[in-house]
Each structure stands twice: as structure tokens, then as C-alpha cells.
Amino acid sequence: MELFKGKTVVVSGGAEGIGFAVAQAVGREGMNVVIADISPDTLATAEATLSEQGIPVLALTADARSEADWDRVADAALGRFGAIHALMNNAGVGGSGSTGPIEDHSAEDWRWTIDVNLMGVVFGLKSVVPHIKAAGGGW
């Protein structure tokens, strides 16, 4: 798809699952792919797989809960590919703080879930959207 050629996407939680599948799909269509994930081992495997498929990839260890990590990801993406055109806020958890009876989970469990699933999205948007706008608002 010509629409994607030469564009750059940042995918959080991009080392496996839906994030990796999206990174792979848009990479095959010509996008530069920046995958950010908290798991260095899984990230290394994902980076190798995408590279072997000829997809331009930058893989960065990052915690979606960290605004500083998001800023670092955006800066690295710009440094490597020159612009950011799209963001897929995919990092998320469904673990200890979000399943089972509410009375079985601590406030810390819920804070962790909210920090990843909500604040991770907020920080991603805050760090990346200005660069998407600078690149023309996507495409």
C-alpha cells in the first residue's frame, strides 16, 4: 500500500501479540517500525524477526508508565527515521489488578493496571503526537 511507504509508526507493546502483528503488517507495507516494549528478551526476538523480513526497525526497551521513556522513544524514532507519522498505543496489562473479584486485589494492583493501561496511553500521546503533527498530521 503506497500510503505506508516511508512513513514511521511507533508501536508500544510491540514485541509480541497484537502489537507485533501490527508492526509486522505495516512493516511489510513499507513503514519504518519503532517497537517499544518492557521485555528486553522478547524485544530482541521481535527485532530480529522484523529485520530478517527486511522491515526497517528500531527496537527500544521502554516502560509505558514512564513519561521519560516515552520521550526517549520519540527522540530515538526521530533520530533514526526523521519523522513520526503514526502511533499505536498497544502496551497494556490484564493481570493481577484487573481480573477476579475486586475485593481480592490491592490498591497497588489497580494503580499498576491504571498506570500501564491509562497513563501509558496519555504519556504516549503527549510524547508522540506533537511529532505526528510536525510531520503533517499523519498522512
Show where each model-derived region lies.
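Canonical Rossmann dinucleotide-binding motif of NAD(H)/NADP(H)-dependent dehydrogenases/reductases
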Residues: 2-34
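Active-site loop of short-chain dehydrogenase/reductase
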Residues: 7, 56, 83-84, 132-139
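The beta1-alpha1 cofactor-binding region of Rossmann-like NAD(H)/NADP(H)-dependent oxidoreductases
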Residues: 40-41, 61-72, 107
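A glycine-rich helix->loop->beta "capping" turn
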Residues: 53-56, 76-87, 106-109
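Conserved NAD(P)H cofactor-binding loop of Rossmann-fold oxidoreductase domains
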Residues: 90-98
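Substrate-binding pocket helix/loop in short-chain dehydrogenase/reductase
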Residues: 98-102, 106-111
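A short, exposed helix-loop element centered on a Lys and neighboring polar residues
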Residues: 125-126
